[in-house]
Amino acid sequence: VTAICGIWNRDGRPDAAQDVARMRRALAPYGNDRSAAWDDGAVALGIGLARLTPEDRFDRQPLAARDRFHLVADLRLDNRAELAEALGLIQRLATLADADLLLAAWERWDTDTPDRLVGDFAFALWDAEHRRLHLVRDILGNRPLFYHANNDRFVFATMAKGLHALPDIPLAPDAFTLMDCIALAPRRGPRSFFADINRVEPGQRVTVHADGRIEPVDWYDWNTPRDLGLRSDDDYVQAMRATFDTAVAACLRSDDPIGSHLSGGMDSSAVTASAALQLAQRGQRLSAYTHVPLAGARLDHWGDRTLDEGPLAALLAARHTNIDHVRVDAAERQIGDDMDAQFHAAEYPPFNLCNQVWMTEICRQMQQRRERVMLVGIMGNATISQQGVERLPLLATTGAWPTLIREGIALHRRGWTAQRVASSAIGALLPPHLLDALRRRFRGKSPPRDLLAYAALNPALVENPDYRAHLEQLGHGLHLPSPRSPRALAVSILRHTDVMGLTAKGQLARFGVDQRDPTGDRRVIDLTLAIPPHLLLRDGQTRWIYHRAFADRIPPELRNQAGKGLQGADWPTRIEQARGTLATELDRANPTAETLLAVPALRALAAADTGTGRVTDAQRYDQRIKLLRGASIAHFIRKAQRRND
């Protein structure tokens, strides 16, 4: 993970390098193994390198080619051999940095280059011949990239603090982005968490022209599945296993020890198992970290969810003699105790403060063990372990009634109630108000449709028809149907937010830990979005292809568990411990926070007595979602306005 920055003074002023030097100093926490810059008077590029792969020792950015192209890149390329073969560089590959391959690729394929890349990347390329600047990010946005533009110049940086190092770009929160964050809405459009600073969106190329035009182009097509040449069911099963192992192998490029998150779920288990098998062949060990609840804590008994994932994770760990299983309860940590550090390092408000506690503690423990790479399976729900239930409404809309009936009966035989089968099959096809009425009739309850039931927004904003229309345009309206196919659901999950890159930068700056997610590998995404729905739900078996691909690796107790794990199940006790911190933060809420948030209601929630009994649905929405996210955003606003009162 590296930090890049640059300035183009379109008015011709020759002092760009001076400001780039300021930006590089501000970005030093994200890359201080090597710092360098390229200066051409009105245009300057800077880089602060963090060496995280073996090939990073060959990195000599900024790079230049033919006195035309000048490149700075924050990247880890995961298809190095494939690129080198296509570029005729395979004999030199061992001594080429990833940036060398990227520049050679751009010389060959120009703006078609991003579609040939696999990995995490954000880069800037100055085309001196055509006087254009290109900014590009990978499809999931695992490396952030921000910019600011005015009539005279264009400025970009990996993190907003690089832009805020310049005196004419003041630090201030972006109210509109924060409103969507409070509403749990998906991120769309270029706005960032900071005023007057835009982001290059995931899967996008932003081209800046000499006349000041800023042209965003989506280089990745989310709408059209790729033809991967797979024909039989077995072809897909074998491709799933092989592609996933290739993705994991790419994430193991490191000279340092490696750790992984290991929950009791399917995604992190698949990642950990694949990594352990491959590391064993090298004679290396793997630390697998599992969050477990505080001893004696009041837990949230939510449906059939697994509250302590430690025992399930231990079953997987026990299969591998080279896994060191570490259970983390973060007993010495408290909700909100590192919000200041989070703000300065990651520069966004954490969405889930109760999970932030153990995630941060795992990074601390990895730092103590000198482990620099952390494997995660965050995107697995949308890729390797898609449940496939959305096949049912797809069958209904295409008129495949015999197949729909057969799958419904098979699900019922596996323990699904008739009501659940019917709701899954036709729920996405019904108007939400009618679906809610049916759920209340047969289940006794339905999920809340009132935005204020789960979002800590100021009620005045919720009543604004323009804002409601905005949410519906995002596909987050309160009365919109659910996705009608597995692919539609997967795309909505993969594109929902854009904070993974910020999370990774924050962990790198604070702990020197580089987060890598093979479940979000471009090849894995292309494959899973092309999988026929009958390989996801088949004969009543959800996640059919996952079971076929990984049955010999994942314990049956884990694969066949009825419910999902509930991370942070000890949140009721955690919140009780942190009520003083949360109340203090809300008491410090400034006018901007009071405009966006329902501050009086949040203060009441911070002081509420939730008792000692079973957690109710209302308490879960109020305490875990509204209170914690509201306090996090109030803190972010205060820090972004440089206020400590």
Over which residues does each language-model region extend?
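Cysteine-centered catalytic environments shared across enzyme families
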Residues: V1-A331, G336-A341, A345
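Adenosyl-5′-phosphate
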Residues: V1-W8, P14, A21-R22, D40-G41, ...
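Glycine-rich active-site loop/lid subdomains used to bind and stabilize high-energy intermediates
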Residues: W8, R34, I47, R305, ...
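Short hydrophobic beta-strand that contains or immediately precedes a catalytic carboxylate
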Residues: V72, L375, G520
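Generic, well-ordered alpha-helical scaffold segments in large soluble proteins
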Residues: A86, T243-C251, S274-Q278, L316-R319, ...
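An alpha-helix initiation/capping motif
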Residues: D100, Q238, S269, Q356, ...
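Conserved acidic
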Residues: S232-Y236, M240, P350, C354, ...
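Phosphate/ATP-binding catalytic cores across multiple sugar-kinase/actin-like superfamilies
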Residues: Q238-S260, Q365-R369, V373, R495-L502, ...
